[in-house]
Amino acid sequence: ARGAKVIVVSSPSKQQTLLSLGADVVLNRNMDLLAELGENSVDVVIDLVAGEQWPTLLQLLKPKGRYGVSGAIGGALVELDVRTLYLKDLSFFGCTHLDEGVFARLVSLIEARAIRPVVAKVFDLQDIHQAQITFLEKLHTGKIVLRVP
């Protein structure tokens, strides 16, 4: 995390795994994050979910904070009071486009075992239905991989 304090919002069942992977704090996704962390308490939010917690995440951001998003499994449409954006001078960015060379660097780090992707389960392509069921149960930590023959 390059010196950053990493706060993860997840289900309680994943807490120990996330702590073992380097999270400093794991908070229950159903708790009142604003009461727990306080307004203007974080510099950066990386959101993979969006949905109903979205407005709270913006309240957590400090002025000049950065909000990055790379998923919307909690709901693709969110409402923004644009005053929050301009009064706090927030920056929003997507996290799906990689600059040239990033993927090759990532692969080289994996090959050198400097970083390790977390794989929850591997399914053969023919078992894609079971893979989807496993994904929807939300009990896994890490990626669900489909093995293509």
Regions found by a protein language model. Give the residues of each.
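Terminal peptide-recognition signature
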Residues: 18, 45, 57, 92, ...
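Well-formed, non-transmembrane alpha-helical positions, independent of function
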Residues: 17, 36, 56, 84, ...
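Rossmann-fold dehydrogenase core element
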Residues: 63-70, 79-119
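C-terminal hydrophobic helical "lid"/dimerization subdomain
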Residues: 100-149
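Residues in the short beta-alpha loop(s) of Rossmann-like NAD(P)-binding domains
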Residues: 12, 73, 98
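Rossmann-fold NAD(P) dinucleotide-binding segment
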Residues: 52-62
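Adenosine-nucleotide cofactor-binding segment
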Residues: 1-54
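A general structural signal for well-ordered alpha-helical segments in protein cores
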Residues: 42, 54, 82, 103-107, ...
